[in-house]
């Protein structure tokens, strides 16, 4: 999916839900809108804090129910290793396999379609008689910006942000 505006993304989600005959409630739409404004993954509780700006009465079950719906529809992915959620940038391709690249330094999460891996996963699943419904592959490492920061040997003379604390220690 090309870079789309938030309004285009929400309109696309509404259209998909109408085609599937499922209800995209105003609350679900608002959670999706908030997700679309994030640069990367966000925890349910951070999402709740954002939702409370518009809906002060919102409680954790409100967010979790909305996230469950958005997960079922393929609009978001759960990043299991960080217990966070990220907008799916490929939700116009409902059967895709996602590869999530998670930066252990800054926490950025980038999604890529893993077409070649998808075939391998289906072959392995078929050997076991396993019926795959959805694949998400998570890989941890450093994003390009953090690789550059970690390679920097002169922090006092560079333009890098050395203040970011490592989110997860490498194994």
Swiss-Prot record:
**Pfam families annotated for this entry?**
FUR
Keyword tags: DNA-binding, Repressor, Transcription, Transcription regulation, Zinc
Q: What's any GO biological process attached to this entry?
A: negative regulation of DNA-templated transcription
Q: Which NCBIfam families match?
A: PRK11639.1 (NF008646)
Under Gene3D superfamilies, the record lists: 3.30.1490.190, Winged helix-like DNA-binding domain superfamily/Winged helix DNA-binding domain
Q: What name does this protein carry?
A: Zinc uptake regulation protein
- Please report the organism this UniProt entry assigns to the protein: Escherichia coli (strain K12)
Which family does the record assign?
Belongs to the Fur family.
């Amino acid at each position: 999916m090309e870079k789309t505006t938030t309004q285009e993304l929400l309109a696309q989600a509404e259209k998909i839900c109408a085609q599937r005959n499922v209800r995209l409630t105003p609350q679900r739409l608002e959670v999706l809108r908030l997700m679309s404004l994030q640069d990367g993954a966000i925890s349910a509780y951070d999402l709740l804090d954002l939702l409370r700006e518009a809906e002060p009465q919102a409680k954790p079950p409100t967010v979790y129910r909305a996230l469950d719906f958005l997960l079922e529809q393929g609009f978001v992915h759960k990043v299991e290793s960080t217990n966070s959620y990220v907008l799916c940038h490929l939700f116009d391709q409902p059967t895709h396999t996602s590869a999530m690249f998670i930066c252990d330094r800054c926490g950025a999460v980038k999604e890529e379609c893993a077409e070649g891996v998808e075939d391998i996963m289906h072959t392995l699943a078929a050997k076991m008689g396993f019926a795959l419904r959805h694949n998400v592959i998570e890989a941890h490492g450093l994003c390009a910006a953090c690789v550059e920061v970690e390679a920097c040997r002169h922090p006092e003379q560079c333009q890098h942000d050395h203040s970011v604390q490592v989110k997860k220690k490498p194994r």
